[in-house]
Regions:
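Interfacial aromatic-anchored transmembrane helix boundaries in multi-pass membrane proteins
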Residues: 30-40, 68-105
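Hydrophobic transmembrane alpha-helices
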Residues: 1-61
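Residue-level signature of transmembrane alpha-helical entry/exit and packing/kink sites
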Residues: 11-19, 45-48, 59-60, 90, ...
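Alpha-helical transmembrane segments in multi-pass membrane proteins
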Residues: 18-26, 48, 52, 66-71, ...
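Membrane-embedded alpha-helical hairpins and interfacial helices in multi-pass inner-membrane proteins
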Residues: 115-183
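Juxtamembrane membrane-interface segments at transmembrane alpha-helix termini
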Residues: 52-54, 58-59, 74-80, 137, ...
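Helix-loop junctions at the membrane-solvent interface of multi-pass transporters
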Residues: 28, 32, 54, 81, ...
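Structural signal for the C-terminal ends of transmembrane alpha-helices
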Residues: 54-58, 108-115, 175-180
Length: 183
């Protein structure tokens, strides 16, 4: 019985460390901007999908939830937050829909079956990222008005960057899924 409790404790500690590491990775990916035209690219959506693909939907969603919670309480984890953070005010701003979309995208990416061909993996990752942008546009339209050019503001500038990130993750996906065996 003690062995079972010890193994369960080790598993909980391992999950906890993965979630903390994922949250740190998300924060770093939000803060580092890669020059890209017309809008600088972060690797945030890549990390969101990476967490789901590598560790499954439970750890992926838990990691994103922790990250969002950190931002809501005022830690400067989001892409545009100042050093002192601004919490709920920033969270409910123009990017809230995208941030909520991270949860659903990580969930879908975590449910991927990687025994299929590369085209199918690519398609599922496109679906995952599409959820982020759909929720982002819905919130943005609600916030700034539906009469604004929402696609030009909230989607089009990021399409090439997303295609790059999805392509990279598609190539890595079959290797990353092997990490699930260790958790």
């Amino acid at each position: 019985m003690e062995i079972v409790k010890s193994l369960q404790s080790q598993k909980v500690i391992k999950y906890f460390l993965i979630v903390i590491f994922g949250s740190i990775l998300l924060t770093i990916s939000a803060k580092i901007k890669i020059p890209f035209y017309p809008v600088p690219m972060t690797m945030q959506t890549f990390v969101v999908l990476l967490m789901g693909v590598t560790f499954g939907w439970k750890i992926g969603v838990t990691t994103i939830s922790l990250y969002l919670f950190e931002g809501v309480i005022g830690l400067p984890v989001f892409a545009g937050t100042p050093e002192k953070g601004i919490g709920l005010i920033y969270f409910t701003g123009p990017t809230m829909g995208y941030l909520i979309g991270f949860l659903f995208a990580s969930f879908i990416a975590g449910y991927l079956n990687f025994k299929t061909n590369i085209f199918f993996i690519f398609t599922k990752l496109i679906l995952s990222v599409s959820i982020i942008y759909i929720l982002g546009i819905l919130w943005l339209g609600n916030l700034i008005g539906w009469d604004k050019p929402l696609l030009q503001l909230g989607v089009t500038p990021f399409l090439l960057a997303e295609l790059f990130k999805i392509s990279l993750l598609t190539i890595l996906a079959k290797k990353l899924i092997k990490f699930r065996k260790f958790i």
